[in-house]
From Swiss-Prot:
Keywords: Cytoplasm, Methyltransferase, rRNA processing, S-adenosyl-L-methionine, Transferase. The gene is rlmE. Its EC number is 2.1.1.166. Specifically methylates the uridine in position 2552 of 23S rRNA at the 2'-O position of the ribose in the fully assembled 50S ribosomal subunit. One of its GO terms (molecular function) is rRNA (uridine-2'-O-)-methyltransferase activity. It is found in: Cytoplasm. Gene3D superfamilies: Vaccinia Virus protein VP39. It comes from Nitratidesulfovibrio vulgaris (strain DSM 19637 / Miyazaki F). SUPFAM superfamilies: S-adenosyl-L-methionine-dependent methyltransferases (SSF53335). The active site is at residue 151. Belongs to the class I-like SAM-binding methyltransferase superfamily. RNA methyltransferase RlmE family. S-adenosyl-L-methionine binds at residues 49, 51, 69, 87, 111. This is Ribosomal RNA large subunit methyltransferase E.
Length: 201
């Protein structure tokens, strides 16, 4: 198991990414073709910045990435990435202005995860709260036909999230990348074809 984990950790360091999570996003994009040149992407829970870097590469210099996280990061981003230190549960006026100025977005991605307590039920409940808030942000700024990717710690209460996703998107897929740790409870919902009517629910 340790060798398996170290493979992605070392690969990330060799390729100048701040975290191994970059390979999860690459697997998701290779499978579902989320990104195209010139797209605008919103990255929630972006620190330390691997997903933002990966998205920036795939949308190219004419694309834009707005990244935010409760924590700051010292990652050096390319010119097409804007990073803001923000709490998605208490969004500042400056962040709302950035959403309005840079949006609407073609893709919203969320790798947000709670600080784990070691108590499975608590961690799953907090993960679900983050997913629901990420979806609320997506409802606010995702274009019709757009895509949404969100990380969830699987548990008994995910049905309410799945129901909300299926009401908003044409296609909802469950995907666990090979680069996820085998013992991890995380998985990703990959949602395609936003209907554009989430705010009316």
């Amino acid at each position: 198991m340790k060798t398996y984990r170290d493979h992605y950790f070392l690969k990330a360091k060799q390729e100048n990414y701040p975290a191994r999570s970059i390979y999860k996003l690459k697997e998701i994009d290779n499978r579902f073709k989320l990104f195209r040149q010139g797209m605008k992407v919103l990255d929630l829970g972006a620190a330390p910045g691997s997903w933002s870097l990966g998205a920036a590469e795939r949308v190219g210099p004419k694309g834009r990435v707005l990244a935010c996280d409760l924590q700051t990061t010292d990652t050096q981003f390319p010119p097409n990435v804007t990073f803001m230190q923000e709490d998605v549960f208490n969004r500042s006026e400056a962040f709302e202005d950035a959403l309005a100025a840079m949006g609407p977005f073609h893709v919203v991605i969320s790798d947000m995860a709670p600080r784990t307590t070691g108590t499975r039920f608590t961690d799953q409940a907090r993960s679900l709260e983050l997913c629901i808030e990420a979806l609320a942000v997506a409802d606010h700024c995702l274009i019709k036909g757009g895509s949404f990717v969100v990380k969830i710690f699987m548990g008994p209460d995910v049905k309410q999230l799945l129901d909300a996703l299926r009401a908003r998107f044409e296609t909802v897929k469950t995907f666990k990348p090979k680069s996820s740790r085998v013992e991890s409870k995380e998985t990703f919902y990959v949602c395609l074809g936003y209907r554009g009517d989430g705010q009316q629910d």
